[in-house]
């Protein structure tokens, strides 16, 4: 398994990295502002209203996160009962409730060159693999080796990995099993 300490340490690094990226404007060209209408509830009165809001940054970063604060959080509870063993997953090392979307433009290299578009990467293929429902989030452990084998690649051939940092336990487990440093 993945220890609580490792999960909390990873979560701290993730929060710090996101905070630094936001502070330094690293994501400004990656996030397109989106204006929507949002229901807002006044906590004191319960009054609901619809207000316009523009989302222009990831709102889920907690830049003031500390390791001491993470270690002080209690394991997640569900209906008053600990989930499974309930020892390690907390609000600090697990995903928050959030909405999001993404898009990716894929085109032929010749078309990109003709249009003076500099590719950010190469799409080599994809693979899918299943796992048990209670093993949510560890699909890469099964799919990545298939994909690498199909293309004659090794983990060390990949410059940048995205394993979804929603849950520290999940990303650390996947990285450990796949041998991603």
Model-derived regions: residue spans:
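Active-site pocket-shaping loop/turn-to-helix segments
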Residues: 5-11, 86-102, 124-150, 159-165
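Phosphate/pyrophosphate-binding loops at sites that engage ATP/ADP/AMP, CoA/4′-phosphopantetheine
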Residues: 112-116, 145-160, 178-179
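Flexible glycine-/small-residue-enriched beta->alpha junction loops
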Residues: 1
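Buried hydrophobic packing segments
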Residues: 18, 103-108, 140-147, 171-174
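N-terminal extracellular/periplasmic Venus flytrap/periplasmic-binding protein-like
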Residues: 9-114, 179-181
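Short helix-loop-beta-strand segments that form the rim/entrance of peptidase-like active sites
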Residues: 118-124
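Short glycine/threonine-rich loop-to-helix capping motif typified by GTGT followed
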Residues: 26, 41-46, 133-140, 165-181
């Amino acid at each position: 398994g993945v220890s609580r300490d490792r999960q909390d340490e990873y979560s701290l690094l993730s929060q710090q990295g996101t905070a630094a990226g936001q502070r330094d404007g690293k994501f400004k060209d990656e996030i397109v502002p989106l204006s929507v209408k949002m229901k807002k509830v006044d906590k004191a009165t319960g009054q609901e209203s619809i207000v316009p809001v523009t989302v222009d940054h990831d709102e889920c970063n907690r830049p003031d996160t500390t390791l001491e604060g993470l270690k002080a959080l209690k394991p997640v509870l569900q209906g008053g009962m600990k989930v499974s063993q309930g020892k390690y997953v907390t609000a600090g090392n697990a995903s928050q409730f959030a909405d999001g979307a993404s898009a990716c433009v894929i085109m032929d290299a010749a078309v990109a060159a003709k249009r003076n578009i500099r590719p950010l990467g190469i799409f080599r293929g994809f693979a899918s693999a299943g796992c048990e429902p209670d093993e949510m989030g560890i699909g890469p452990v099964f799919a990545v080796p298939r994909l690498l084998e199909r293309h004659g690649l090794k983990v060390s051939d990949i410059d940048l990995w995205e394993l979804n940092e929603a849950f520290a336990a999940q990303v650390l487990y996947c990285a450990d099993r796949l041998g991603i440093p």
